[in-house]
C-alpha cells in the first residue's frame, strides 16, 4: 500500500475547494392547467415576459402571449399532443430567434428555419430575432432604384422600386402568385436574394412553385419558407416574420432582397384563431384589435438603407385575397394603408383572357417614376394615358351606334395596346424588350395589324431585334436611356420587320 502524506491530502482538498463555484440558477417553473387547440393555460411562471419561449416536458416549445393575474396563456409551436394537465413548464429566458446564413439559399424551410426539403441540416453560426425592430427614419433613404418584375403592365405603369412595399390584391385564382413568382424569375442575374413565404397554402401549390423555380434556375438565389394549411396556427402566424428575418440578414450585409408574403389573409386568419382561443376580445370581422399592428410591424421592416448601413434593401410584395372583389373589407383596407401602392388583379379581366389580369385604372404605385429607368420613362408616359382614355371610350362606345373616324382609330389603338400587355406565365421580359414593345404600340406601328396578329408580331419582332439589331439592346442596357441612336435603330427594325411580317402573312393566306 502506497503511503500518502497528510499534507498531500490537504493540498488536494484545498485545490478542490478553490475550484468549487457555488452557482445559483433560478429556474422559473409553472404547471399546465389546461391544454388543447394549440393553446395552454399555465399556473405559476410569475416572472415570465410577453413573447418569451416556454419549454414543456415533452420538448414542445410555446410562446407566452397572455399574461393574466392568475395564469399565463401560451400558444404551442407544434401539436403538443403529449402535454398533460399538471405537467411542468419552464421559462427559457429567450425570445423567438432563428439561425441565419448564406447556406439557406436554395433551401425550403419551415417557420422555425428548420429544413423540410430532405437535404440535410443548414450550417449557421449567427442568430437573428424573428421579431426585430424596423430601420428608423435616419437609417433609410428614399427609393430610387427599379425592381424590374418582367411584366410590361407593372414596369411601365405601376413601377416598383427597391425598398418599396407593393400589395398584390385580388380574388382567388386571378394570378396573384404568378405575378409574384414571375418577379422572382426576373431577378436572375440581378444579384437580388428572394424569399418566398407560403402561408397556409396547399402543399401541392408550394411544390409547383418550387418546381418552376428549380426548372428556371431561380433556387440559386431563393429561399422558400413554407407553413402549409395543415400547420399549427402559431407557425402560420410566425412564418412571415421568419421570412423577413432571413431577408434582413442579407439586407444588412448591403445586398438587395425581395420578399413575397403569400398570403397575409391566411396569416391574419391564423392570428384570429389564436386570439379567439386565448379569449382576447374580438373586433371587426372577429379579428383582434391589434391585427393592424400584426401587419404594420412586418411590412415596416422593408426598407432602402442609407449609405452608412451599406445601401442594402428589402422589397416586400405582400399578397392579400379578396372575396368577390371587395377591397373595402378589414384586412385589405389595413394592408392598402400600410403599403406604398397596390396592384389590383380582376377576375373579370382574367376570365376575358387578359393575363396578367391587372386593372391598370385602380392600381397605383406611390413611388412612381422614381423607380423607373430613364428609357422606360421616355416611352411609357403615353401608355397609361392612352389606356385610360381607351377604357373610357370603350364604355361610352357600347351605347353609341355611329362613331367618327378619330374615335374608331383610338378604340383600335387601345385594343392593340391592351393586347401588347398580355404575357404568358413564367416568361418575364427584359427591360430593353419592354421598351421596344411599348414604343411599337404607342407610336402606331401595330395599327395596320389585326388584333389577333399583335402578340405573334411582337414575339417575332423581339427575336428579330435580338438577332439583327443587337446594338439597340446594348445601348438601352448600358446607358439606361432611349437615345436618338437607339430610336433610329428601332425604327429601322420596325420598318424592316413589318414588311417581312406582312409578306409572310400574305404568303400564308395564298397557301391556304
From Swiss-Prot:
Any Pfam family: ATP-synt_ab_C
GO CC list: chloroplast thylakoid membrane; proton-transporting ATP synthase complex
Membrane topology category: Peripheral membrane protein
Major site of localization recorded for this protein: plastid
Molecular function via GO: ADP binding; ATP binding; proton-transporting ATP synthase activity, rotational mechanism
Gene3D superfamilies in the record: 2.40.30.20, ATP synthase alpha/beta chain, C-terminal domain, P-loop containing nucleotide triphosphate hydrolases
Residues the record marks as site: Required for activity: 363
Highest taxon listed in the record's lineage: Eukaryota
Protein family per UniProt: Belongs to the ATPase alpha/beta chains family.
Name of the protein: ATP synthase subunit alpha, chloroplastic
Species of origin: Chaetosphaeridium globosum
